[in-house]
């Protein structure tokens, strides 16, 4: 019961993302990579990497592949991207990741509305819950789709 009360309290506190910094933009041909970072309430530095494919094969349009991790976690990719911060602010972290994604859309395309799909890397059951929350943070028209291989994407039905 306490966990539910803590989650409900957190939902009420998560409308504002943490302040974040765009660390780097690297463009090459039809692709780009943006790196952001921010500190959560435990002062863990979270790194957000957005790999951009301007003409995705699967969805035929700009696709963002998003990974985020605690910078103090392991160098092992599987461990790093599966690590929880245990700071009790997961929805605020997701809100900040979405703010980074919106900023990346603005930086590269003028608006998040021009992005066709967003793919989050991660195999944790939490990601489905996080994606539902992320979907609410985006403009209307974004849906959650599962494609072959188990990848879960947010897809923008407003783009052509």
Label the model's feature ranges.
Residues 2-160:
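Non-catalytic substrate-recognition and accessory regions of acyl/acetyltransferase enzymes
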């Amino acid at each position: 019961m306490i966990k539910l009360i803590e989650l409900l309290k957190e939902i009420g506190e998560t409308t504002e993302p943490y302040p974040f910094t765009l660390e780097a933009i690297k463009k090459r041909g039809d692709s780009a990579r943006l790196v952001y970072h921010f500190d959560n309430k435990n002062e863990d530095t979270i790194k957000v990497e957005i790999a951009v494919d301007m003409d995705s094969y699967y969805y035929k349009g700009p696709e963002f592949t998003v990974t985020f991790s605690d910078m103090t976690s392991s160098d092992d990719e599987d461990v790093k991207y599966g690590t929880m911060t245990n700071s009790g602010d997961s929805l605020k972290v997701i809100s900040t990741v979405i703010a980074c994604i919106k900023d990346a859309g603005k930086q590269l395309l003028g608006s998040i509305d021009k992005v066709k799909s967003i793919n989050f890397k991660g195999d944790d059951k939490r990601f489905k819950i996080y994606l539902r929350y992320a979907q609410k943070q985006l403009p209307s028209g974004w849906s959650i789709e599962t494609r072959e291989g188990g990848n879960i994407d947010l897809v923008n039905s407003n783009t052509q």
